[in-house]
Amino acid sequence: MTITTENKTVTHILGYPRVGSQRELKFAQEKYWRGEIEQNELKEVGSLLRHRHWGDQVGAGLDYVSVGDFAWYDHVLNTSMLLGHIPKRHDNGFPDLDTLFRIARGKAPTGCSCAASDMTKWFNTNYHYIVPEFTEDDQFNVSWQQLFGEVAEAKKAGHKVKPVLLGPVSYLWLGKEKEEGFDRLSLLPRLLAAYQKILSKLEALGVEWVQIDEPVLALELPKPWAESFKLAYQVLNGNTKLLLTTYFDNITHHLDKIVELNIDGLHVDLSAAPEQLNAVVDALPENWVLSAGVVNGRNVWRADLSHVLDVLQPVKAKLGQRLWVGSSCSLLHSPIDLDLETDLSPEVRQWLSFAKQKCREFLVAQALDGNAIAIQECAKYSAPIKARATSALVNNPDVRQRTNAITAALAERTAPYAERTRQQRAALNLPLLPTTTIGSFPQTNEIRTQRRDFKAGYLTEADYNTALKGHIADAIQRQEDLDLDVFVHGEAERNDMVEYFAELLEGFAVTRFGWVQSYGSRCVKPAVIVSDIYRAKPMTVEWTTYAQSLTDKLVKGMLTGPVTILGWTFPREDLPRQGIANQIALALRDEVSDLQAAGIKIIQIDEPAIREGLPLKESQWQAYLDWAVNAFKISAASAEPQTQIHTHMCYSEFNHIIKSVAALDADVITIETSRSDMELLKAFEEFDYPNEIGPGVYDIHSPNIPSIEQIVHLVEKAETLIPIERLWINPDCGLKTRNWEETEAALRSMVEATKKLREQWQEKAV
């Protein structure tokens, strides 16, 4: 078969990681924020990375390079900037890069500091975005030129470009009203006028196709929102072709509306929802292209290209050149380059594929076009992932036997909360409004250097452990000086709250350069679950008991919960998520038992990821919540009644799942609430949460120091919903990313505010 441009299968990705394989963007951003480099130097790093990443795509043979997927903080904030949609407190007339940073962080090298905008999770991922703020009188004005500059930049380099835009309906959905009494959907006509201008500018730049992302189509949308797409895409129709992109789940429940839209192509995620393919193909209008998202942008596993070929060959036969092949979603969620991972075992390495390698998996398009050599290469490429199913490394009979023996009783504490709290109050003897922190303290340059030197072999294990004990002792003394009530050991030994446990539990592979952006300059390095999971020995007991030996105050044991470990790693794909979570839960249960036996009276099991793990469709939530809650309870249920179990949730908009949060049966839950001005506590207006709660009283993601008055205001607001005897006082989240000066100043305000509140309460009691 002769391949021509007429019948060639077009290849593209929905986006590429932006931080750089060595986190170049992160380090440049942080230098700029500290005033160590000028803005033009930061922009040079961005340009260098964009050209490198376009080169990766072209080098892999992709037909289009994605432009507009680069962002200085996140792509939703980029969209706000593009639309001139700036919160009034940050609006200085003409938006620039420092405007963007002030919206995201509350401060920038120029301009006045003020409250950062809210930040939340991007659908069910561990990526975050800055939430757009909508008011009734909002206007949209295309004023920030970054997208158009990048298109010109890529075209000048000789690339065939496909700009990436967040669609108007999704943009509105992802924001929130800052005023009561109006619906942000009413802003759609005004917003569409701005989008028309954007598309006209792209057309003038010679753009043929625009990728317009509408991921909310995977949700079960309210009727007015679902119907709004018809208006949106009537208005946006023009000479530039629109590829409507959906991802993360099935969209067939909206298919009848989608096929009526005035667009030129549809992208569907066949990694997350392969079952939708036939329905989409059957309904596809005859003049549309179908972009099949078959290269998984959310995992690190090598694609089974032989299977992909089998699935797509009938579609190719039916659609011909109207079939495109793409990534399931943006490759933003994948690490960048597997070639850097020289420390992984050869057996594990051959199962994996990172963003750069995933671009090469579009070899399958050549196979679809009938290239015999490509068909053979697809079979060769797929062989390791097929052989993995029978690898002795993957399956552990003892772990399977233990998980198969799980019963309902294994997930229950030996006493109900009412009895536990009575015993705990007697055993712990804490004051009204106990003060504590969430777990981590600043990871200083000294700590990071010592960890790096230890891993490189420049520091012996004995010397490293001595250094860590010094950092723990320092953290304990600082807490003594601050007069906190419940201490933490500070987690100096942990580089990451999940990776630390992944290194100590059997069943994980840990990478060196597998960084993935979480938000802004914050990157995480998810471990990979390659086999059955179990605990070979205690993981945290030594450090926790050492910290406890240094003080008469209570020191919390600190664990990361099973759902979060699962959610913040790359899971294996041959076991259901519930089964993996139960394996982790049993390992943590053993750790809880050992901490308790060592005299630790408060144990925190963090579950910040429980909300983000929810399926996108609300009708599927309860099934997920049932097994997620059960996994947490399995991990905690070995605790005796007098042992107090804490859990922590951050960025968790859990108002809709409050009953499941209560079902965790944690004695104390701490949550992020300050950035939303305690808005998350609205859940407690209608639901009487039975246990103790610590609503975060200041935002640790901002370097701004809270005042005593601000904290008092937030606690008084919380007190209207939670009885004061069940309130704890704590920051929103861990303090790992802050420096000690900021940390101590903020905690000093928190403790002083608490003492002031106690005095007020005592005066009331008299």
Curated annotation (Swiss-Prot):
GO biological process: methionine biosynthetic process; methylation
InterPro entries to which the protein is assigned, alphabetical: Cbl-indep_Met_Synth_N, Cobalamin-indep_Met_synthase, Met_Synth_C/arc, UROD/MetE-like_sf
Any Pfam family: Meth_synt_1
Pathway where it operates: Amino-acid biosynthesis; L-methionine biosynthesis via de novo pathway; L-methionine from L-homocysteine (MetE route): step 1/1
Chain sites annotated for binding Zn(2+): 648, 650, 672, 733
Active site, UniProt feature: 701
Keywords assigned: Amino-acid biosynthesis, Metal-binding, Methionine biosynthesis, Methyltransferase, Repeat, Transferase, Zinc
Protein's UniProt keywords contain Repeat: yes
Residues annotated as binding 5-methyltetrahydropteroyltri-L-glutamate: 23-26, 121, 522-523, 568, 612
Residues that hold L-homocysteine according to the record: 438-440, 491, 606
Record EC number: 2.1.1.14
N-terminal signal peptide: none
The keyword Repeat is assigned to this record: yes
Cofactor(s), names only, from the UniProt record: Zn(2+)
Cofactor: how and how many bound: Binds 1 zinc ion per subunit.
GO molecular function: 5-methyltetrahydropteroyltriglutamate-homocysteine S-methyltransferase activity; zinc ion binding
Entry binding sites for L-methionine: 438-440, 491, 606
Catalytic reactions on record: 5-methyltetrahydropteroyltri-L-glutamate + L-homocysteine = tetrahydropteroyltri-L-glutamate + L-methionine
Top-level enzyme category: transferase
Superkingdom in the source lineage: Bacteria
Coiled coil (UniProt feature): none
Entry similarity comment: Belongs to the vitamin-B12 independent methionine synthase family.
Functional note: Catalyzes the transfer of a methyl group from 5-methyltetrahydrofolate to homocysteine resulting in methionine formation.
PANTHER family assigned: 5-METHYLTETRAHYDROPTEROYLTRIGLUTAMATE--HOMOCYSTEINE METHYLTRANSFERASE
Protein's UniProt name: 5-methyltetrahydropteroyltriglutamate--homocysteine methyltransferase
Species of the source: Photobacterium profundum (strain SS9)
Gene: metE
